[in-house]
């Protein structure tokens, strides 16, 4: 992508994105094209595919839960075409790295609502908590411990007592206790990972 087109695309995207400057958007576009290939190159892919994205989540942001990583991919891939476009990449990273609490609540709820029905069900909580907990060899029935955690989560967060969490339930619980934002599994990067990623993206990519 030539400099003029890059600046044009960065300018258009930076109008949509509130958490990155125009030069930062330029760097993220450059990084995107190193991942998928240059426009016009016959080997260039349609976008960032699921495997490439999972490698980024694992190697750069330290995520290990396959189910959560798959849901994060779906959160970025707004049009559900199985590829992350350059716009989806920059918009997704804006919330992922620097979102407001409200944006992060919306994002995390979308990750945890595994079947997309607008609720985090008892079964979904069970699957996510089971995946995120280390199994103790001494436990006779590890599922019992997970079931207990699900009940604790519902008791604390299910304000309308319908045995599932609506967005309103989740939002209210997190606003009252911010630590509940990632109650069902890590789906946001920590500050150390963010700094390392931005150092690479905003410093090293400018040298390319």
From Swiss-Prot:
Ca(2+) 3 binds at residues 158, 160, 162, 164, 169. One of its GO terms (biological process) is regulation of cilium movement. GO terms for molecular function: calcium ion binding. GO terms for cellular component: cilium; cytoplasm; cytoskeleton; sperm flagellum. SMART domains: EFh. Ca(2+) 1 binds at residues 77, 79, 81. Ca(2+) 2 binds at residues 113, 115, 117, 119, 124. Pfam families: EF-hand_7. It is found in: Cytoplasm, Cytoskeleton, Cilium axoneme; Cell projection, Cilium; Cell projection, Cilium, Flagellum. Residues 64-99, 100-135, 145-180 form the EF-hand domain. Keywords: Calcium, Cell projection, Cilium, Cytoplasm, Cytoskeleton, Flagellum, Metal-binding, Repeat. It comes from the Eukaryota. Component of the outer dynein arm-docking complex (ODA-DC) that mediates outer dynein arms (ODA) binding onto the doublet microtubule. Seems to regulate the assembly of both ODAs and their axonemal docking complex onto ciliary microtubules. Regulates ciliary and flagellar motility and is required for cilia-driven determination of body laterality. Component of the outer dynein arm-docking complex along with ODAD1, ODAD2, ODAD3 and ODAD4. This is Calaxin. It comes from Xenopus laevis (African clawed frog).
